[in-house]
């Protein structure tokens, strides 16, 4: 099939790569405009654009899609069979969705109708889910509400964080996408409507969600740290500065001391903090304007002592 691919970040790269290597023909890629990134605010292309250009695939980067007649005309001239959308970053208007022969499908990183919206992977980890998944659905006007072609389930383990789960879902999504496209082309697949009454929404992550409330349970804080490891990172006040908690481990349920209190120093592993329920062994941290370091190095370098508090 002649495919136009819509996607922007790393999550979309796996699906584009799979399509390029498949029997389908990627006739164009639509992605977000290049944006300034990092401390130096250097303008950088989206990861999807980098891959597309490597394979000499035409790339469109419209500032806006709705009402963009020039883009619509260019896409129409490509005579696409289907549009594939993976984390493009903007909602597509109906005239675009309905342009191709087989309309438009989307790779979404949740078990729909759970976690429609922008941050399904983060929310699944933060809310302590034991499983998530990826679905291929038809795009409709309403956000993530289209009929579902196929889904695959993936367990969430305590070893997972936002990075590992993101990568697993991106890979599984790419495989499922190819399988779905083959079945659509052969007419071997039926769409199933979502149960809209069961729909939940994964709103975008806000910076302040990184702030740790030590009165919460060890399990809740552990999930927060894993989910927000890339951005904004879980953080807490310590002494007269802010410290980011990058890795931790639940060690036991007994209580000693106040929430936020450092109750034990484990020289080669880090330091133990009491929470509202249970304790956390802090294993990796980051101080302002510094690189991430092991909590054991932080104990030595910053002379962290029992009885000090994170707040």
From Swiss-Prot:
InterPro entries: Fmt, Formyl_trans_C, Formyl_trans_C_sf, Formyl_transf_N, Formyl_transf_N_sf, Formyl_transferase-like_C_sf, Met-tRNA-FMT_C, Met-tRNA-FMT_N
Protein name per UniProt: Methionyl-tRNA formyltransferase
Top EC class for this record: transferase
Family: Belongs to the Fmt family.
Entry EC no(s): 2.1.2.9
Highest taxon of the lineage: Bacteria
GO cellular component, one term: cytosol
Molecular function GO terms recorded: methionyl-tRNA formyltransferase activity
Catalytic activity as recorded in UniProt: L-methionyl-tRNA(fMet) + (6R)-10-formyltetrahydrofolate = N-formyl-L-methionyl-tRNA(fMet) + (6S)-5,6,7,8-tetrahydrofolate + H(+)
Record: residues binding (6S)-5,6,7,8-tetrahydrofolate: 110-113
Taxon lineage: Bacteria, Pseudomonadati, Aquificota, Aquificia, Aquificales
Described purpose of this protein according to its UniProt entry: Attaches a formyl group to the free amino group of methionyl-tRNA(fMet). The formyl group appears to play a dual role in the initiator identity of N-formylmethionyl-tRNA by promoting its recognition by IF2 and preventing the misappropriation of this tRNA by the elongation apparatus.
Pfam families per record: Formyl_trans_C, Formyl_trans_N
Swiss-Prot/TrEMBL keywords: Protein biosynthesis, Transferase
NCBIfam families tied to this protein: fmt
